[in-house]
Amino acid sequence: MDTIMKKILSIIALGAAFAFTVSCDLSEYNPNEPGYEKVFSSPTNVQYVINGFYGGFGSVTNAYSKDAATDYFPAQTLSARFQKGYSATSASSWGEWDDIYKYNYVLNQLNSSAAAELSAAEKDDFIAQVRLFRGKKYYDMVKQYGDLPWFDHVISPVATDDEHKDRESRDIIMKHVLEDLDYAIGHITATSPDATCVSKEVALFLKMRACLYEASFRKYNNVTASAKGEAFTNYTVEDLYALAADAAKQIIDGGKYSLVSDWRSLFLSDNLQTKEVILGAQTAANIQGSQNNFFVYTKQNAPKSLTRTFVNTFLMKDGTPYTDKSGYATDSWKDEFTNRDPRLALTVRYPGYKFAGETAVPDFGASFLGYQIRKFCLDQYADTSGADPDEKDKHNSNSTPIFRYAEVLLAYAEAKAELGQMDNAVWAQTVGAIRQRAGITGSSLTTVPSTVDNYLKTNYYPDVTSAAILEIRRERGVELCMEGVRESDLIRWGCGKLLSTAPWDGINVAAVNTALDLDGNGTNDVCFYTDASKKVDGVANIAVDGSTGLTVADNGGKKQLMYNVDPDLRYWAPDNHLILDAIPSQEIAAYKKLGYTLTQNPGY
């Protein structure tokens, strides 16, 4: 095997499967090395190179971990960007330009004599795949930084002006992103029956996400110009919503995907549910990786729990709001699951939950607030206490969806509602279909809502007046919970402050310093104590004296668990500038030293 391919294969793991690795540093390649010309002359070798780019989709636990430290999922440690004191001086990250270089390098080779032995069809397909990855990477960076320099070629080592050009308007960058994704949509011929590789539908999905994000980010954050004050001229908000709707509609009309009947199977099956999953990560029980074991993951680095404020947004099974029910605010943990959206009990532990044949209440030592996640967890692997000596050898074998059809339906519904084009037919096709799959009944499946839900409006979206948009946002929260979109959704909806202000509240408990039977089965389960002398033998004893951040608060005659962190560690700036990362001051200084300008984002 030639030297170049050895370099590639030593870094690109798992071949044509989802690699989830850092790809090779193509800047190391020397065109004069023996065998260099062979790398891009073989379709197999080129595909190996492209497979190294799949790490850009994240690890199999990326979605789960990305939703930590949001409004509905507390954490001990938050992103530096959302801590008080974050500034251009403390910022250290500025783009992922090594990845952009790699994409451009491969594109350069595919358009050169190095790829002369490839057929025109092979070359076109490979170029389309690489442009998909470049478009996705730039879209990710637009979300993080806004304006960016655009590079569509390999920079010469002596091209100092090119290397140090200032950022261009995000409006211009989005035009380039959509050009890349449109090329991928029109030219990718590769298919992926097991949903582990990019395809035309993956490109459409990325276009849908990018346009929906950009439209709502501009609308709800009142962003109309670049950091330098240049007005956007390529796309209006309406243009972007329309593009998002069109991309989603193409996937819908393609007829390749539909909703699976068993929602939980999406997250527990060994093989990806390709009826609904557009792109996913295939895993295996005998390969130790970051997904193994999801139950271990949910028990480490407490607190790992949903909040009660968010759990309250799950509807009743008949499609009516739980928060319209008299006395909902003081419901016990046992009672609040009664007649609820079935997805609630499939997302968190519920009264009567069992593993290994034994009833199990939430593990409050890890899930402080009582809503312990089980969405991705194989229940038979739930015992991570060490009591089972063989447990250490058990690993999750369930694969993980990355992009799925339900999100397409929700994006289509949102874009149509924002455009003022929502009707009963679209509602039934999208939100209604998702709720029906979940087991919800009633008119909310077929009729566009007309009554604003005051709980959603008060606790989450005070500036939204459309009942339909509120319900679509409810449905995104419930359906896509712990799938890695929450932070992005809040920021694009102009609700970033919820990352700081949303209460991290938990279940209601009857009393402290006494043993409690949470699930009503006649056996005491836990004692929440403020006085260590009040611990009770034979139950889980959980301190609520603030020593771990966990306390109790009065809630209409009951006690409610609350998790608190230092306010400086959970911060949102009043001027809203945290919608974007800072450009590190050291980068700006380095440009200035060489006589160039690198524009900072507003507020820093």
List PLM regions with ranges.
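Bacterial Sec-dependent N-terminal signal peptides
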Residues: D2-I8, A13, F18-T44, V177, ...
